[in-house]
């Protein structure tokens, strides 16, 4: 289910109204978030939800075991890291190696392999929730937060639909405690959330999608394009990719605000950066932060 789809425009108000007016208390709201998030994710392909649940269960158990068996905590952490990265790598690169195997099989005279053998669908957003799962395991290991024993709470943290498929990639120390607290409706938060959602839609539909028309027209026949056309196409592409990424992030942040959840800022005017280093501190901030912290402490 895409943010800029008719289905999402029906889905969001229904989830919002039931969340605030039918659910009572933290537990029921967390459960409602989990159910709606899995419905949202399963809209692409219901099989994706099984992988998300597996990742959630493994990381949930990892956190508890790290606390329960401190002498084995580092081994437990690395087992969870290798398992999650192994799953991510298998889905990310299976088709690449399968295509190579297909070519080798044909070259050796064995014929082409069946399509179902060599192609696997890449689950939407698998990188985002994998990194977020690892964030939790790392933070528990570093004693930045205690392991949660509430399964629904943890599932809500890892599957929260506004940022499930396109980020921001949240640190467990920021997002998980918000699901551990009671939340009350705030009119100011709702208004601010809607403002950010509309701004995100503007970036996506008015800027990114319109720039994409020009980019596709120029690069679909780049051999015949002039130097000026190619330069213009490159310029339009920079606005397209920014509008896509930051637009989706704004919609996610605004949607989170509707439910009393504050997500981190993900883009901070990257094209006004002074240098490359400054650019990467402003572009997809949550991803860059995750890599910096993960590299420093694992």
Predicted regions and their residues:
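Membrane-embedded transmembrane alpha-helical bundles that form the catalytic cores
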Residues: 1-295
